[in-house]
């Protein structure tokens, strides 16, 4: 494999010294970039784009041509897993993802198998291999999956949800069925992420987008427990390097200690928590990723720089282990030049903290 020219992102996740704070953006390959829109139009639709390794690699690399980002993230979707399980994923204009065959009972759970990462999901592995080749060792490649709980919310609700009534009904009325589903999903995510690592992902991330809708007790039982199972079973060394694992629960600020106790290398933070507080609580155990509100990218350049400065100051210069990111995905109507201001500000303003 090609030698890695910029390994700052991996070093920061492992709390090793770096000369500036590395940065990437959730959804950095996406609709805010005109070149992405052009490639997506060429593909025809979103899933066709994911399933074409050449085009998936092209959109993964697009933000790196514009901005000096310190990592690339696989262009894919968390719903590849339920789609491969046969739930019939489709997209309705303006409504987001939907499933033709949602999970409603034990028979539905029994029916789904664990998809083969080099079978039904081979297109994802082909994309990973293609991206690694096309990156030529410039920056590391991040692989990812949704968390079992977050995947289950889409599978039981039949798509996106605001109130999560169907899955919460299952959770309280028939918890055994939900545990059966979550267990199957955890086994699937383990195989899926390990296959991404074997195909060339140099770090992996688990997105628990909807963990924050749970009570503290239910978060531990229905979300964290399964992420812990995943962390325990992941390949942690490949190509002679550590493969860092990041867990990200949106609105999970009250559970940082429990998340850190899973043995993950890093925790993703959203913007609702102060990074200085997070560092005080768990900075000795894990690296932190985050945590600027993506909406700040609508602001004037000076305001963006000011926010970057505040977050860097919050993390401080005591110890290492900060990867700068947004607290969630970049919005689709952010001017690309503002993303450039953000990335440049992180590099420039963080250097004094690493002397």
Swiss-Prot record:
Keywords: Cytoplasm, Decarboxylase, Lyase, Porphyrin biosynthesis. It is found in: Cytoplasm. The keyword NAD does not apply. It is an enzyme of class 4 (lyase). It catalyses: uroporphyrinogen III + 4 H(+) = coproporphyrinogen III + 4 CO2. One of its GO terms (biological process) is protoporphyrinogen IX biosynthetic process from glutamate. One of its GO terms (cellular component) is cytosol. It holds the Pfam family URO-D. It comes from the Bacteria. The record marks 77 as: Transition state stabilizer. GO terms for molecular function: uroporphyrinogen decarboxylase activity. Catalyzes the decarboxylation of four acetate groups of uroporphyrinogen-III to yield coproporphyrinogen-III. Belongs to the uroporphyrinogen decarboxylase family. NCBIfam families: hemE (TIGR01464). Homodimer. This is Uroporphyrinogen decarboxylase.
């Amino acid at each position: 494999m090609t030698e890695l020219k910029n390994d700052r992102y991996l070093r920061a996740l492992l709390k090793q010294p770096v000369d500036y704070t590395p940065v990437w953006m959730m959804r950095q390959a996406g609709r805010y970039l005109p070149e992405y829109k052009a490639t997506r139009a060429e593909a025809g639709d979103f899933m066709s784009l994911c399933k074409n390794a050449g085009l998936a690699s092209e959109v993964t690399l697009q933000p790196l041509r514009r901005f000096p980002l310190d990592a690339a993230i696989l262009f894919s979707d968390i719903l590849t897993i339920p789609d491969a399980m046969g739930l019939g994923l489709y997209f309705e204009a303006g409504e987001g993802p939907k499933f033709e065959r949602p999970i409603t009972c034990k028979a539905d759970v029994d029916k789904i198998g664990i998809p083969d990462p080099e079978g039904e999901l081979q297109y994802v592995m082909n994309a990973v291999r293609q991206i690694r080749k096309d990156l030529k060792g410039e920056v590391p490649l991040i692989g990812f999956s949704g968390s079992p709980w977050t995947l289950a919310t889409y599978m039981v609700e039949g798509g996106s949800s605001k109130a999560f009534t169907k899955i919460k009904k299952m959770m309280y009325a028939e918890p055994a069925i939900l545990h059966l589903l979550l267990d199957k999903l955890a086994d699937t995510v383990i195989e899926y992420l390990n296959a991404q690592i074997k195909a060339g992902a140099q770090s992996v991330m688990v997105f628990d987008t909807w963990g924050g809708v749970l009570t503290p007790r239910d978060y531990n039982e229905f979300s964290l427990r399964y992420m812990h199972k995943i962390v325990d079973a992941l390949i942690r060394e490949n190509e002679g390097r550590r493969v860092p694992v990041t867990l990200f629960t949106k609105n999970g600020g009250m559970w940082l200690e429990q998340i850190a106790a899973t043995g993950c290398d890093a925790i993703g933070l959203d913007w609702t928590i102060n990074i200085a507080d997070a560092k005080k609580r768990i900075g000795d155990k894990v690296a932190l990723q985050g945590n600027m509100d993506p909406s700040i990218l609508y602001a004037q350049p000076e305001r963006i720089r000011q926010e970057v400065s505040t977050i860097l100051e919050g993390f401080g210069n005591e110890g290492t282990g900060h990867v700068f990111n947004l607290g969630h995905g970049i919005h689709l109507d952010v001017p690309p030049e503002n993303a450039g201001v953000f990335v440049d500000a992180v590099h420039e303003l963080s250097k004094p903290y690493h002397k």
